[in-house]
Amino acid sequence: MTHPPKTPLLDQVIYPADLRKLEDRDLPQLAREVRDEMIDAVSRTGGHLGAGLGVVELTIAIHSVFDTPDDRLIFDVGHQCYPHKILTGRRDRIRTLRQENGLSGFTRRAESEYDPFGAAHSSTSISAGLGMAIAADLDKNDRRVIAVIGDGAMSAGMAYEALNNAGALDARLIVILNDNDMSIAPPTGAMSAYLARLASGRTYMGFRDFGKKLTAYLGKNIDRAITRAVEHARGYVTGGTMFEEMGFYHIGPIDGHSFDHLLPVLRNVRDNARGPVLIHVVTQKGKGYPPAEAAADKYHGVNKFDVITGAQARVKPNAPSYTSVFAEALVQEAALDDKIVGITAAMPNGTGLDKLAEAFPSRCFDVGIAEQHAVTFAAGLAAEGYKPFAALYSTFLQRAYDQVVHDVAIQGLPVRFPIDRAGFVGADGPTHAGSFDTAFLATLPGFVVMAAADEAELKHMVRTAVAYDAGPISFRYPRGEGVGVDMPARGEILQIGKGRIVKEGTKVALLSFGTRLADCLLAAEDLEAAGLSTTVADARFAKPLDHDLIRQLARHHEMLITVEEGSVGGFGSQVMQYLSSEGLLDNGLKIRSLVMPDIWMEQAKPEAMNAHAGLDRAGIVSTVFRALGRGVAVGVAG
């Protein structure tokens, strides 16, 4: 383990007010020290490295020029917020990032007044910033609002909806487009810096304002013509863009690692801008740390790593990950069925669809951060007889719920939804937890909703989804490795709406939906040791429910517990609805539903989160004993 870096200048900066006391010539040294501090911290905690390293100069420049927190600074997604946290009173806790009771890996309103808006999902910053800018106008307050958004987040329609609205409202909003994909040639040399300063200065902005005042007297048609003439005239020097067509004053691109470029432009915009401004800043992911510069994709999100070599800590898995099992099973099926296609929303590696893209590049589509489009795109493919697998994280499927309902479910189109990161996800906290998919999908008529109990079951569900053409079908599975069961050479086609008995008993029935099955089996051992004969069943389906299985468990056991790593309103609620409608609660059946608690659970290790929720072995046993009026006198086996 390396020693923390020496940071004499950073040691003088606790809050941005301290930063604003520094001379401009000191800022490059401060940037080096912030980078060193961030690299050391993330090497100890893991987290998002590349994005933060890429915005060190930009973050320092913004806090140097603007009066934060009175001026509002909003980061889109939040992957790049670590330098911001270091400079806003949280450096003393930066080595608790993403740990239980530690700093969030994203911006969070409850954490600091310097985080005016929380983030973790993409493309929300401009909308939130516009709301704050309009609030400032209504309050007759001259505070500035700055939204920093990456080029990747600009692939989502919500960002353009906000830009369009901001332009129409002529809002006092500053949008900084952080272009770290190098998709647009980076600016170089003094001429680029000069043009950016010129375009952000009083003369050019005054020319634009004069045009606006003139057209106020001449009607809408003349207004549009003169406004476009002004922007196009400026475009000959600075480059015209679609942002100008939306009503934004566009500046850049400028070098996001040069204070000589950043400071004068930001100061000009601060002092002169009266309407919406977009500053195009080009940065490099991983800037200042050679391993991250050389492999930006591998250093976007990292485990703990060696600062000297860049080597990341890897724990040898005991079993393959659920994501890899899904990917391999899908590739296997795709080799046998050329109607199978894969769709991902900017997460090919995270969802495992990169494996499908390698094997069948023409049948795998990365649509960018555009979940709504992804789902309706899949619906169009399904309408033409293809078998689309729209692989999304549970938390991101939420972004496309209307499309799931309107474009897929109502039309009964056979779109397949592999739902990754179901349940607790650990360090990313409540914004990324896969809590709600079972609840919001199982309410939809005609939807088939499955959950894999282990990696072999997941393989069965992939093949089942391939074979099912009667309507939409989903299957959920968690982050991380499987439980180590024997794997079939190929998955089996499951009977729709049928679960399975895993262990027979007579007094207590544990009905699991998903990967809590392993803990149910362990809990059954402890209950048997306490003299309570226990049945364990794997539901497999939340919709359609296995009515025969549920009736059998209800009629032949004193107690029934449903167990799921999902929210209130999910599988357990579906079971309860069926039991009540069939009168199966009328004869004194004791029933309990174990779910994720109805709170926003903070980051921790998934096993700790399951224990807190009562979804682990000990929690299940404790629930049984309490329901039966017995003290927990028998120790739970370790």
Curated annotation (Swiss-Prot):
Function: Catalyzes the acyloin condensation reaction between C atoms 2 and 3 of pyruvate and glyceraldehyde 3-phosphate to yield 1-deoxy-D-xylulose-5-phosphate (DXP).
Cofactor note: Binds 1 Mg(2+) ion per subunit.
GO molecular function, one term: thiamine pyrophosphate binding
Protein encoded by which gene: dxs
Family annotation (Pfam families): DXP_synthase_N, Transket_pyr, Transketolase_C
Enzyme nomenclature, EC number: 2.2.1.7
Cofactor: Mg(2+); thiamine diphosphate
Binding site for thiamine diphosphate: H79, A120, H121, S122, G152, A153, N180, Y289, E371
Cross-referenced NCBIfam families: dxs (TIGR00204), PRK05444.2-2 (NF003933)
Species: Rhizobium etli (strain CIAT 652)
Catalytic activity: D-glyceraldehyde 3-phosphate + pyruvate + H(+) = 1-deoxy-D-xylulose 5-phosphate + CO2
UniProt-recorded name of the protein: 1-deoxy-D-xylulose-5-phosphate synthase
Amino acids binding Mg(2+): D151, N180
Claim: Metal-binding is one of the keywords in the record: yes
Family affiliation: Belongs to the transketolase family. DXPS subfamily.
Protein origin, superkingdom: Bacteria
Family annotation (InterPro entries): Dxylulose-5-P_synthase, THDP-binding, Transketo_C/PFOR_II, Transketolase-like_Pyr-bd, Transketolase_BS, Transketolase_C, Transketolase_CS
Annotated GO biological process: 1-deoxy-D-xylulose 5-phosphate biosynthetic process; glyceraldehyde-3-phosphate metabolic process; terpenoid biosynthetic process; thiamine biosynthetic process
Keywords, comma-separated and alphabetical: Isoprene biosynthesis, Magnesium, Metal-binding, Thiamine biosynthesis, Thiamine pyrophosphate, Transferase
SUPFAM superfamilies cross-referenced by the UniProt entry: Thiamin diphosphate-binding fold (THDP-binding), TK C-terminal domain-like
Pathway(s) served: Metabolic intermediate biosynthesis; 1-deoxy-D-xylulose 5-phosphate biosynthesis; 1-deoxy-D-xylulose 5-phosphate from D-glyceraldehyde 3-phosphate and pyruvate: step 1/1
Subunit structure: Homodimer.
Signal peptide start and end residues: none
